[in-house]
């Protein structure tokens, strides 16, 4: 019988702001953003498996296994271990329990991949350090490294050069409009600001920062614009990532709860507190 040997969270993240400060020679954009984690997460459960086989149990996703980021993470980590000459790896089964909405700007898939890499590396003897795991994660998705890094940070480059910071940890009301965001449409939109003035890890809180995708998403999706206006009646509100989620900032959970009661019931919403140490890292160091 399979035995649960490790259970780890795959937390959400917020982009407290997001600027594009130019285009790189490789076609990517240079970004500046602040990542902060939430105490709201998917869960990965790791089980022993007979015959050294590997499996993924995903109850909620219609994504084929070979396209699932958890499976891609497992495959990539096995390959890296084998390149190091470590081939006798114990089999395991990973159960993915989803809680985070998809297509939300919360980094759910990337967080799943990061937790898979960190968890499997621990189960297999911790032969890779954080920098090596981040290098694997970078090939899976631009947001994977920050979840492995595990601390709130001011991020630059393509979002993978980190300076640790300790911003306030308020309560957030996070709401997902019922829209599907095309990232390609956002990057090609004429209203997208691509040359923001740079800020720094020390002064970003004193600057007029924003999410450059927010006006574009609101222009393309009136539902987002209307929800944003409604939430602004209660608290400062901003888009996270490229959307579709909006987050409103409150000093207390009660204030966030009162605002949540006004959110239409057909929309996905939740309340969470900001975390400067990732819940994944907190769990591993308990």
Curated annotation (Swiss-Prot):
It catalyses: 4-CDP-2-C-methyl-D-erythritol + ATP = 4-CDP-2-C-methyl-D-erythritol 2-phosphate + ADP + H(+). InterPro entries: GHMP_kinase_C_dom, GHMP_kinase_C_sf, GHMP_kinase_N_dom, IspE, Ribosomal_Su5_D2-typ_SF, Ribsml_uS5_D2-typ_fold_subgr. SUPFAM superfamilies: GHMP Kinase, C-terminal domain, Ribosomal protein S5 domain 2-like. The active site is at residues 13, 143. It comes from the Bacteria. ATP binds at residues 101-111. Keywords: ATP-binding, Isoprene biosynthesis, Kinase, Nucleotide-binding, Transferase. HAMAP family: IspE (MF_00061). This is 4-diphosphocytidyl-2-C-methyl-D-erythritol kinase. The lineage of its organism: Bacteria, Pseudomonadati, Pseudomonadota, Gammaproteobacteria, Alteromonadales. The gene is ispE.
């Amino acid at each position: 019988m399979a035995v649960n040997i490790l259970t780890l969270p795959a937390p959400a993240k917020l982009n407290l702001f997001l600027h594009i400060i130019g285009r790189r020679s490789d076609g990517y954009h240079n970004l500046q953003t602040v990542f902060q984690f939430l105490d709201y997460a998917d869960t990965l459960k790791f089980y022993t498996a007979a015959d050294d086989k590997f499996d993924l149990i995903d109850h909620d996703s219609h994504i084929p296994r070979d396209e699932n980021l958890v499976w891609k993470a497992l495959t990539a980590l096995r390959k890296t271990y084998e390149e190091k000459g470590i081939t006798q790896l114990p089999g395991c089964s990973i159960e993915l329990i989803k809680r985070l909405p998809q297509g939300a700007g919360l980094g759910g898939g990337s967080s799943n991949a990061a937790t898979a890499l960190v968890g499997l590396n621990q189960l297999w003897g911790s032969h890779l350090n954080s920098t090596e795991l981040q290098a694997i994660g970078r090939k899976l998705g631009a947001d994977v490294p920050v979840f492995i890094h595990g601390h709130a940070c001011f991020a630059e480059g393509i979002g993978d050069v980190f300076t640790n910071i300790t911003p306030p940890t308020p309560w957030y009301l996070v709401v997902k409009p019922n829209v599907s965001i095309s990232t390609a449409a956002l990057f090609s939109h004429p209203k997208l600001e691509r040359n923001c003035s740079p800020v720094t890890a020390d002064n970003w809180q004193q600057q007029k920062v924003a999410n450059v995708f927010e006006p574009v998403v609101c222009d393309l999706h009136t539902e987002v614009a209307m929800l944003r206006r409604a939430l602004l009646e209660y608290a400062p509100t901003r888009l996270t990532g490229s959307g579709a989620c909006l987050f409103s900032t409150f000093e207390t959970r009660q204030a966030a709860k009162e605002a949540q009661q006004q959110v239409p019931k057909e929309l996905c919403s939740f309340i969470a507190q900001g975390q400067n140490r990732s819940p994944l890292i907190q769990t591993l160091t308990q």
